A protein has these predicted regions:
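Cytoplasmic membrane-interface "Motif A"-like loop-to-helix N-cap segments
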Residues: 57-70, 286-299
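Juxtamembrane intracellular "pre-TM" segments in multi-pass secondary transporters
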Residues: 180-209, 242-251, 422-424
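Glycine-rich segments within core transmembrane alpha-helices of 12-TM secondary carriers
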Residues: 45-48, 123-144, 359-370
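C-terminal ends and interior cores of transmembrane alpha-helices
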Residues: 66, 70-85, 299-313
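C-terminal transmembrane helical hairpin of 12-TM major facilitator-type secondary transporters
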Residues: 291-336
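Helix-loop boundary and gating motifs at the non-cytosolic
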Residues: 1-45, 207-212, 216-233, 237-239, ...
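Helix-to-loop junctions at the C-terminal end of transmembrane segments
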Residues: 46-60, 276-290, 377
Length: 428
């Protein structure tokens, strides 16, 4: 079920990572501006912890999830109706709203996992959840991208995005979730929640967990830029041929090649590899140290980035590098979710709020890492972009590894089933 929950959450993120860069790049917007747009659409996820407590109250989290998916899907649909580049402001405004509501979908999912799962299940759940988040959400954006290149109307590919956000969310209605029990008034309940969260954050596990999430490690930030940089790999590869063609024919050739490459990297093959990486990562995280696996995800990200940086700027480099990055991205996100769920532990009352604090920190890291990466495009080209991403991951892995080793904050290496509580006996 968490695969479907992840898909509902992942559609707006995939829009930001795949469809939005493709649409604005197609409208002849510079990659430098795309970096600003991606950063803008991540802003709601930085502050969602401020309003995330709402899903810890009133109706069940699964009902919140469906309601938020309906609103977010409608916002994405309207965003797709805007003409670029003339209506880029309302285009981004409705996408911004979709991200705002989808962030709360993530809060619902985190709360459901934290409250209902035992420790030995957290990696598995995180794997399937991120398979839906990345692969399921990514497929929606890929379908919309291909529909765009094939000349479909905005209402058609916008409708696909909305349907793939709302449809999977409805499956969560079949998940068993106990009714909410609120002690005292709403104000008193909110006060208790704030105290619980504040006390948790000042523990060693809370502080080091936030630092880990704020770092560039395992952010897989380049996943948000691949559809934007694809054109650079094409124009470099076809420079001689493009010089001989009229402007319209050259633009059509580039567009065809870009669509083909995005279809491979972000399509069924790429999303399938992402799902494999997420499920495998979740399996591994249930059997070893989760924080160590999170640091390993940063090393793997850097390895792919360095490989692309030192390879020729060609379509082959983009395709093979992008597919490897897709595989590693799944591993990164599964390790992130498993690490966060382990850090906050089993909690029914404030689970969504705690989970959102960590995901907000992680989204800040994704945004600033991608933003810094994109600054290297004008001076060093795409090799500088992927090289910067690798350097940030390596530096953060070294620093955090030393900090965790010094503080003894790597967490548990074994995740055994939690013992059942003894049944009370009535003495006659």
């Amino acid at each position: 079920m968490f695969f479907f929950a992840g898909t509902a959450y992942g559609v707006p993120g995939a829009f930001t990572a795949v469809l939005m860069p493709y649409l604005v790049r197609r409208a002849h917007v510079d990659l430098d501006h795309i970096g600003w747009y991606v950063t803008l659409l991540f802003v709601p996820t930085w502050f969602q912890f401020v309003y995330a407590p709402v899903v810890d109250f009133w109706i069940r989290r699964k009902h919140w999830l469906v309601l938020l998916a309906l609103i977010g899907g409608a916002c994405l649909f309207v965003s797709c109706q805007m003409t670029l580049p003339d209506q880029v402001v309302p285009f981004l405004a409705f996408a911004f709203l979709a991200q705002t509501f989808s962030g709360l979908i993530g809060s619902c999912n985190g709360g459901l996992m934290a409250a209902g799962l035992s420790d030995e299940q957290r990696g598995k759940a995180g794997g399937w959840y991120n398979a839906g988040n990345l692969a399921g959400g990514g497929i929606s954006a890929t379908i919309a991208t291909l529909m765009t290149s094939d000349g479909y109307a905005p209402w058609q590919f916008g409708g696909v995005l909305a349907a793939m956000m709302v449809g999977p969310a409805l499956a969560m209605l079949f998940v068993h979730e106990p009714a909410r029990k609120m002690e005292g008034t709403l104000v008193e309940a909110i006060g208790r929640l704030i105290i619980q969260v504040r006390e948790f954050l000042w523990t060693k596990a809370g502080i080091t967990g936030i630092l880990l999430c704020l770092s560039p490690v395992g952010t897989a930030a380049l996943a948000n830029y691949f559809s934007g940089v694809a054109q650079d790999y094409v124009t470099h590869d076809l420079a001689g041929e493009l010089a001989k063609l009229p402007a319209d024919a050259a633009a059509k050739l580039v567009d065809d090649h870009v669509s083909h490459m995005i279809g491979i990297v972000s399509g069924l093959l790429g999303q399938g590899l992402t799902a494999v990486g997420a499920i495998a990562g979740g399996f591994i995280c249930d059997r070893t140290n989760r924080r160590a696996m999170y640091l390993l995800s940063g090393v793997l990200t850097a390895a792919v980035g360095l490989g692309m940086a030192f390879s020729p700027t060609s379509e082959s480099t983009f395709i093979y590098g992008g597919l490897m990055y897709a595989l590693v991205t799944g591993f990164c996100y599964a390790a992130f979710t498993a690490t966060v769920l382990e850090t906050i532990g089993k909690d029914e009352k404030s689970a969504s709020t705690k989970y959102t604090l960590f995901t907000a920190a992680g989204n800040v890291a994704i945004a600033y890492t991608g933003f810094v990466d994109s600054r290297f495009d004008k001076s060093y080209g795409v090799a500088g972009v992927v090289g910067c991403d690798a350097a940030l991951n390596i530096a953060a892995v070294v620093v955090l590894g030393l900090v965790f080793w010094k503080l003894g904050s790597f967490g548990k290496s074994r995740h055994v089933p939690e013992p059942e509580l003894p049944v009370a006996k009535v003495v006659e």
